[in-house]
Swiss-Prot record:
UniProt catalytic activity: (E)-4-coumaroyl-CoA + 3 malonyl-CoA + 3 H(+) = 2',4,4',6'-tetrahydroxychalcone + 3 CO2 + 4 CoA
Organism (species): Ipomoea nil (Japanese morning glory)
Cystine pairs: none
Entry protein name: Chalcone synthase E
SUPFAM superfamilies for this protein: Thiolase-like
CDD domains: CHS_like (cd00831)
Length: 389
């Protein structure tokens, strides 16, 4: 007769969880940030709001974003005028879009990750799906399982309405699943479509306007597992530790509420200040056990909530400008894609490291950090170890 301890030991993986593949996707419709204010005020029938349009132009200019991808085309918006209004009942129309398109966009990213991984999809044991774009039953995890043709026995976990920190959450969860289930291969998918938050401008709700200047659509997928088969699988990053915390005195700093008018977005002015004030504490807690105190010795993957957050974090920690290069690149090319952003940055970092001939996947460095920030204010901190190129 075996003991529970023996069974437990046999169930666990030996080594740390590793990211084995990354895939990303966006809708085809690309919007240029420099011309977006004209388009946005025209499509929402708001051109009479001249001063507000000038304000929005300045927001877009300061955003450090060159372009974004959006499922909502001019044609779709013309067919759904309530989505273009500031506060018109429109949840049904938004839901009809996202419950179909969120899993579809996730499928494109997942297929790329599975292709890079190079193993049959029947080996996927777990699915973790995250979106802040709409809710449904059965969820986007179920729809993706069907779209990809995964095994009906795949163990699914669906996270709705977590917001911008959730790219860190899905990695933390997948790490625990991979390390506690021998042979587990976890497909992680974040898929975000701004059809839930798009709305016309209003003088009374400038934080909503900030969202209209920043948010873009995108999906990203990872394959995560422990003890990679050296003949068949190629690790990209090892996941060393993962933590979540709620920042003190930050209640109400970022809120979202699902209403008849869609998902409303509320933002306090001092979000960058709150994050930069507390970020060093999170870093110390994560890296003290490793004896690391030089934040410039790390490679950095930070959720690009907006340029002000990145600027204040950089200043507070005295980071060299190149530390947030991959993060700023993704913000510039895609905008803020909520939970998917940090996965896009991981992809950008390993590709740029390879292209530049650096000797690790983390810009030639050994240790790195991944930060997710979002409603709460909630912060996810993941310690990464790069892999030799």
């Amino acid at each position: 007769m075996v003991t529970v301890e023996e069974v437990r030991k046999a169930q666990r993986a030996q080594g740390p969880a590793t990211i084995m593949a990354i895939g990303t996707s966006t809708p085809q419709n690309c919007v240029d940030q420099s011309t977006y204010p004209d388009y946005y005020f025209r499509i929402t029938n708001s051109e009479h709001l001249v001063e507000l349009k000038e304000k929005f132009k300045r927001m877009c200019e300061k955003s450090m974003i060159k372009k974004r991808y959006m499922y909502l085309t001019e044609e779709i918006l013309k067919e759904n005028p309530n989505i273009c209004a500031y506060m018109a009942p429109s949840l049904d129309a938004r839901q009809d879009i996202v419950v179909v398109e969120v899993p579809k966009l996730g499928k494109e990213a997942a297929q790329k990750a599975i292709k890079e991984w190079g193993q049959p999809k029947s080996k996927i044991t777990h699915l973790v799906f995250c979106t802040t774009s709409g809710v449904d039953m059965p969820g986007a995890d179920y729809q993706l399982t069907k779209l990809l043709g995964l095994q009906p026995s795949v163990k699914r976990f669906m996270m709705y309405q977590q917001g911008c920190f959730a790219g860190g959450t899905v990695i933390r969860l997948a790490k625990d699943l991979a390390e506690n289930n021998k042979g587990a291969r976890v497909l992680v998918v974040c898929s975000e479509i701004t059809a839930v938050t798009f709305r016309g401008p209003s003088d009374a709700h400038l934080d909503s306007l900030v969202g209209q200047a920043l948010f873009g659509d995108g999906a990203a997928a990872l394959i995560i597992g422990s003890d990679p088969d050296p003949d068949l699988e190629r690790p990209l990053f090892q996941l060393v530790s993962a933590a979540q915390t709620i920042l003190p005195d930050s209640g109400g700093a970022i809120d979202g509420h699902l209403r008849e008018v869609g998902l409303t977005f509320h933002l306090l002015k001092d979000v960058p200040g709150l994050i930069s004030k507390h970020i060093e504490k999170s870093l110390n807690e994560a890296f003290q056990p490793l004896g690391i105190h030089d934040w410039n010795s790390l490679f950095w993957i930070a959720h690009p909530g907006g340029p002000a957050i990145l600027d204040q974090v950089e200043e507070k920690l005295e980071l060299k400008p190149e530390k947030l290069r991959a993060t700023r690149h993704v913000l510039s090319e895609y905008g803020n894609m909520s939970s998917a952003c940090v996965l896009f940055i991981l992809d950008e970092m390993r590709k740029a490291s390879s292209k530049e001939g650096l000797n690790t996947t983390g810009e030639g460095l050994e240790w790195g950090v991944l930060f997710g920030f979002g409603p709460g204010l909630t912060v996810e901190t993941v310690v990464l170890h790069s892999v030799s190129a």
